[in-house]
Every structure is written in structure tokens, then in C-alpha cells.
Amino acid sequence: MAAQAGSHGAARVISIILMVVGVLMIVMGATTYAMVSATLAAENIVVSEDACLGGREVAGPLPAYCEAQIIATHSLEATGGKTYAQLDREDPLRAVAMNGSFLRASLFTSVVAFGVSLLVVGLGILFILVGVALLSLAGKKQATAGA
């Protein structure tokens, strides 16, 4: 009986830890999402009209992705379909390709940051649900053991 009471106590502690960690993950994930969004919005980038979501402010993952895609299209059009690596070292269009590549990499980094922050929020929700389930099971087992 004492061993069961100890395991129920441990289950309760673990469930509370899971729920606290879950809440922290949700807060941190949401904060990161908001920070990335605010940083992008502060750049005043507007998606090119000829892109998906044209005319929208880049402050979220979808507009950032659309802008990165159209930058690739414009860079390739400007360089005659050649990438940075394919252009001669002395070709003045190499700078265009390089700038396009850097801009795309920056936008894709923000898209990844949005994705990771949403993943952290989702995992936080999962931690809370597992904690609640564990707490519920520990309570039921304790009630059954006491009967």
C-alpha cells in the first residue's frame, strides 16, 4: 500500500512538472512567434505584386515564403536564369544573384523560426494534456486503492 501511495505521489509531481513545462513552452513559443513577426513587420517589406499574397505586409510565415519565392524568380530573370555559382566572378550580375540569395536565406530563416515556435507551442499543449491525463489517472488509482 505504501509503495502505491509513493508511486501516486510521484505521478502527481511528474504531472505537475509536465503541465508547468507545457505552459512555459506555450509562452516561449508564442513570444518567439511574436518577436519574429514584429521584427519582420519593422522592416516594412511588402510582398511583390506578382507573387502569391502580393501586396501583403511580410509579418508572417506565408508572406515571407511568398516573397522569398518571388525574389528567386526575379533574381533568375535578372541573371538570365543563372545562379550565383553559375555566374562568372567578374560578371556584374553576380551581385544581384548574391543579394537575392541572401534575402531569400533571411526570409527562409524567419519561416523556419515561425515553424519552430509553432512546434514548441504544440508540444507545450501536448505536455499539458499528458500532465492532465497522468494526474487524472493517479487520482483514479488512489481513489480505487483507498476503497
Place the predicted regions along the sequence by residue:
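N-terminal extramembrane/targeting module of integral membrane proteins
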Residues: M1-S48, A147
